[in-house]
């Protein structure tokens, strides 16, 4: 059965030169048509060495169906490959952040975005057409500061569709239970949107390697709730950056070991977290 993301997957992993000009022209024209001079929503892609994945992500964003005025921006986070050329070829407004980390890249995007509502986008991920509007049904509610969603992986020769179904079902059940007391731990950058006015009053952490999005969500709690959208039509599809070369079973066992150590946390709230040394960015 054909999936909504199959055509984006057809160029995913291909070098810049391997993508047909006709496809690149289509993406470029679609992106240009989406840009509003007075956006309510900013959709900001961060990319580090994503030459072989960025165009597929932008193709999906170019086909968003939304009733809101939007802008789509890019951040080139000190890439050493041809990521910048992809932005240029597709005519996407972008900014360069030489300080390398997701935190610095997210901060650069926030500083240059115009919209009241800010959507974080990862360059190795595909987004369904209704993603923005469905997320906005939550984000525009009173007393909400930010919203996150679930996500899926696309099947490949090493990850079967049935195996992914089981893996995601168990993961989603755990995240659902966890979100009642610790919603900030359920937030992932690829599926994160927030009120930009609130975010500019706090700080996106640039001193940690992972978890800057969850940390931002925690900082936004005084302004409103962290809420979640449970809708299959708003479920992005991504690659295996969070799993790496592991099999699903290996990843599952690793997650069980990690989450099992602090399982009691799902029963109480927390407003402050201590940093672990291995997650701190070393300053030269």
Spell out what each predicted region is:
Residues 1-60:
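N-proximal low-complexity "stem/linker" segments adjacent to membrane-targeting elements
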Residues 149-155, 163-185:
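Short, flexible, basic/aromatic active-site loop/helix in glycosyltransferases
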Residues 97-113:
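Glycine-rich, basic loop-to-helix element that forms the pyrophosphate-binding segment
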Residues 130-161:
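Conserved donor NDP-sugar-binding/catalytic core segment of glycosyltransferases
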Residues 118:
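Short aromatic/hydrophobic "clamp" motif used to bind/position activated sugar donors
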Residues 209-216:
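Acidic donor-binding loop at a coil-to-helix junction in glycosyltransferase catalytic cores
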Residues 60, 76-84, 125:
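A conserved acidic beta->alpha catalytic loop
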Residues 59-69:
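Short, acidic, metal-binding catalytic loop of nucleotide-sugar glycosyltransferases
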């Amino acid at each position: 059965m054909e999936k909504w993301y199959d055509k984006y997957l057809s160029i995913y992993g291909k070098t810049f030169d391997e993508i047909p000009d006709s496809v690149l022209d289509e993406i470029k024209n679609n992106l240009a048509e989406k840009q509003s001079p007075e956006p309510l929503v900013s959709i900001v892609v961060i990319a580090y060495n994503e030459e072989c994945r960025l165009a597929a992500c932008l193709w999906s964003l170019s086909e968003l169906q939304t009733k809101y005025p939007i802008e789509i921006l890019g951040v080139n986070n000190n890439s050493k490959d041809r990521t910048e050329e992809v932005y240029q070829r597709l005519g996407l407004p972008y900014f360069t952040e030489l300080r390398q980390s997701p935190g610095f890249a997210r901060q650069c995007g926030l500083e240059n975005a115009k919209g009241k509502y800010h959507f974080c986008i990862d360059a190795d991920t595909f987004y369904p057409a209704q993603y923005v509007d469905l997320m906005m049904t939550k984000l525009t509610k009173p007393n909400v500061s930010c919203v996150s969603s679930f996500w899926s992986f696309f099947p490949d020769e090493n990850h079967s569709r049935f195996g992914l179904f089981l893996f995601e079902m168990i993961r989603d059940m755990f995240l659902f239970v966890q979100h009642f007391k610790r919603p900030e731990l359920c937030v992932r950058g690829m599926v994160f949107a927030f009120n930009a006015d609130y975010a500019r009053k706090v700080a996106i952490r640039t001193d940690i390697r992972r978890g800057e999005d969850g940390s931002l969500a925690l900082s936004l709690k005084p302004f409103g709730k962290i809420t979640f959208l449970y809708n299959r039509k708003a479920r992005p599809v991504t690659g295996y950056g969070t799993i790496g070369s592991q099999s699903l079973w290996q990843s599952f066992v690793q997650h069980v070991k990690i989450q099992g150590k602090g399982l009691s946390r799902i029963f109480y709230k927390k407003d402050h977290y201590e940093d672990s040394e291995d997650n701190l960015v070393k300053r030269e």
